[in-house]
Amino acid sequence: MSRRTRSRSPPRRSYNRERRDYRKYDDSEDQKGARYNRYVDDVSSRRDRHDSFRSHESNKIRRDNSWKHDKYSYEKRYQERDREYARSKNIPDQYIGRSPRPTSHRHAEEKEVDNKTKSDETNPVLQGSATEIKPQPRRSRFDRTERVGASLSVSEIQSENPRVDVIPKDKAVENNHQRNAEKPVASDKITDAKLLARLERVRAWKESKAKQEASKKEEHKLNTKPQVTAKDQNAMPSTGISGFEINRQKDTSDMKRNNRVHMDDEDGPRRMNLEDYQELWDQEDRGMLGNEQAASMEEDEVDPLDAYMASLVGTTDTIRPGLLNTEVIDPNANDDERMVISETLEEEENLLALAAKRSKKKDVITVDHSKINYEDFKKDFYVEPEELKNLSPAEVDELRASLDGIKIRGIDCPKPVTSWSQCGLSAQTISVINSLGYEKPTSIQAQAIPAITSGRDVIGVAKTGSGKTIAFLLPMFRHIKDQRPLKTGEGPIAIIMTPTRELAVQIFRECKPFLKLLNIRACCAYGGAPIKDQIADLKRGAEIVVCTPGRMIDVLSANAGRVTNLHRCTYLVLDEADRMFDLGFEPQVMRIINNIRPDRQTVLFSATFPRAMEALARKVLKKPVEITVGGRSVVASEVEQIVEVRPEESKFSRLLELLGELYNNQLDVRTLVFVDRQESADALLSDLMKRGYTSNSIHGGKDQHDRDSTISDYKAGVFDVLIATSVVARGLDVKSLQLVVNYDCPNHMEDYVHRVGRTGRAGHTGVAVTFITPEQEKYAVDIAKALKMSKQPVPKELQTLASQFLEKVKAGKEKAAGGGFGGKGLSRLDETRNAERKMQRKAYGEDEEDVETEAEAKSPLEKITPEKSTGDPTLDRVRAAVGGIAARAFANQTAQSNKLTQPISIIKTDGDEYKAKMEINDYPQQARWAVTNNTNIVHVTELTGTSITTKGNFYLPGKNPEPGEEKLYLWIEGPSELVVNRAITELRRLLLEGINHSLEGGNKPSASGRYTVV
């Protein structure tokens, strides 16, 4: 029972009315007697009990205050009782009055007075003596000194302090022998040879360490550098762990051990020497000598610590786990040896870092097609109908002209069909087509389906909403059904890659009506959705995979490539291929394509296909047939295009006017508003909601789940107005969408065509309104061109803006706007990288040094001799281009290596301090970040023991600092030239990593809205 619980017992219990001592009694009978006496004497009235209770409460409060300082205080009357009890039990006088627990320092004087009074009254030897006796201090169970017993003399007891004898070792051993002689079983001599050998090793080891201690201390004094204080208030100290000086005069027991760097007095790291524990062991030995039992243990039993440490002599030193990352260097090694070891360790760390980086990088396992025996497959299924065989070339040209002017590039292209029955489709496919309401093939379908079914690689270019998806889906179903079913562990037969997630979902939904009847399984793999569900679908088996390039790379590289593979893939579709390459997916697309068998069938479709994309497309195609319907980048004739030139302030009011006119006349219609930026989409959404229009926004900054649900609600009619960026400019198909508003003018013609093409699909009509401000005159040229190509009237205001801009371009006052997606892909990547490298070389001042290397990189490509030629001109051009890229990469790498290897001067100050200045202003942003972020700075300072400070200001290339200012640089300070050089080497390594990362990933698309693969 606790103290507080006992003190608050009810007052009706008679034995708790009076104040009593709450210490623990040793005799239970004494407790019972005291309780009985108090119970018999308690015959007071109720009032007395009440007064007693009040007294009890006041005493309790006073007692609680006393317990705050001394938990076990005594009163005079209870001490007298203890003395009587001690006499009855024959307890020695010296223990009378001693508390079984230590008292507080605050009441030490009171305890001494109580003990003196008790001793004077009870000890007959000390009665009448004027000498005060102080109580014996409480000894810990860990004390090895001899306790003073009752047999001590009076003079010893009367001494000022209690005596603690320290018996010499030889005397202790002698006394131990005498005591052991009285024991019949004890032995006077150790006969265990193993124990004697251990004792001998311990003595020899202690003697050798004692001899080395003096020489080591003197050597340490010589090597210790004088302490230098920082003169600048903002400057960091130059020595110590992490750049801070450690006051080694203080006790270092409270210092936290660093798990990475061993806190040592020397500049460089050293081994953990056993002599560091010598002082601790000597103190332990001195404590053992003061105890007789310790003296006997010296001969009978070896201390476990000494025996264990002695067994380690001659073995390899073990480094603590916390020091695994620390360099282990001999403390007696000179500076040259330390530098060699340091460079070796740095090289190993670089290799480990590179290996870790490569292990984290997701990459598809490269497939050697020459070592794989692929199954044969058939891709020519087309049988020309009898009614088409008899058509003459003139009649075929007339038929193609009637189908929106189909243009063909390539040889042996099949004739276009006029009905579904001529396509050679199965009965199940025809039934699904009829249920969907497709009466006859569209222009692109009439020509593309026979071409793809005959096994040709096809490039299909057609206007938006012309049915391009069905044009490659129907031949794909026929292609899949001709092959054997999938086995466990086999990958898909057909892959459809798209640039956006919304387009992938759209194509997957168009596949669904055919899958059940044809007994085909499909999987949609795109970013933002849980990858575990997609992996589960692939493991169950899927003949069709609709995917985005990034997620397909994740799936192929997951679990070391054991999730799925591309060995069975024979049909590849690249939908909106120009946009895929423009978004920077060219490396991912090529990695996927290179892992598909070379004799595959490849199909490319898009509404816009610039000429500059042809060379890129032909890398993945073999003798393709190009089918163009209605021209390149042409808006469908079903769309009414309206272009208005108006200031920025009037656009919102005009938008409200258009929405009011539309919804006053029609109810179940949809409106799509395009803006340029995500912030503009959210701001416009807020404004429309305030005006009472049910609307929502979609852009790349939203989660994929939100984007999918937004499109589903938009198609279902939950809201009528959708505000979006160009993320839905391709693939979005909503039948009731009748109004498209380009709130922000598109910056090139291809984007304009795709935005406007969201309406007027599948034969329906629609309206597209575009707002353009007078400041956006450079975009007026492309919009006017699109109107002319689609045979729409061009407004006078728009034509005036276009003419004014063209005049400025001719006069050299303006630069022509970009031509959309043309010239992008690999060409854009190479040009951008070359421009960045030129800027970096110019900033580094390396133009003159790298003239020869740059000339070699720009030299004409090596001619492919007939012996080296592969027979394929496309492959030969690719090999030559790869050689040129390798030469440019080598030139850039050489230039940066020359810059980083330039020496940096180290200055020695008067206070034996070494300083160095390392400029970082002209390096790329990622390289500057690598050497200025706190994590790397702390790592370098802990590794080298230097102080690194970032000083100066950053200036853009071509700008000079103001008078009295300096460009951005690192100020390195250290106690020796060795540590400063090591810091410079480590910083150069970080700079090189940052430069390489900047060159490799500088042109990758932003990761906003991307998924995270766990």
From Swiss-Prot:
It comes from Schizosaccharomyces pombe (strain 972 / ATCC 24843). A motif (Q motif) lies at residues 418-446. GO terms for molecular function: ATP binding; ATP hydrolysis activity; nucleic acid binding; RNA helicase activity; U1 snRNP binding; U2 snRNP binding. Changing K468A: Decreased ATP binding. Decreased ATP hydrolysis activity. Loss of function in pre-spliceosome/complex A assembly. Its EC number is 3.6.4.13. ATP binds at A462, K463, T464, G465, S466, G467, K468, T469. PROSITE patterns: DEAD_ATP_HELICASE (PS00039), HELICASE_ATP_BIND_1 (PS51192), HELICASE_CTER (PS51194), Q_MOTIF (PS51195). ATP-dependent RNA helicase involved in pre-spliceosome/complex A assembly and mRNA splicing. Bridges U1 and U2 snRNPs during pre-spliceosome assembly and enables stable U2 snRNP association with intron RNA. Through its helicase activity probably catalyzes an ATP-dependent conformational change of U2 snRNP. InterPro entries: DEAD/DEAH_box_helicase_dom, Helicase_ATP-bd, Helicase_C-like, P-loop_NTPase, PRP5/DDX46/KHDC4_KH, RNA-helicase_DEAD-box_CS, RNA_helicase_DEAD_Q_motif. Pfam families: DEAD, Helicase_C, KH_12. A motif (DEAD box) lies at residues 575-578. PANTHER family: ATP-DEPENDENT RNA HELICASE DBP3. Residues 1-11 have a biased composition (Basic residues). One of its GO terms (biological process) is mRNA splicing, via spliceosome. Residues 15-87, 106-121, 827-838, 855-875 have a biased composition (Basic and acidic residues). The Q motif is unique to and characteristic of the DEAD box family of RNA helicases and controls ATP binding and hydrolysis. Residues 638-802 form the Helicase C-terminal domain. This is Pre-mRNA-processing ATP-dependent RNA helicase prp11. Changing E576A: No effect on ATP binding. Loss of ATP hydrolysis activity. Loss of function in pre-spliceosome/complex A assembly.
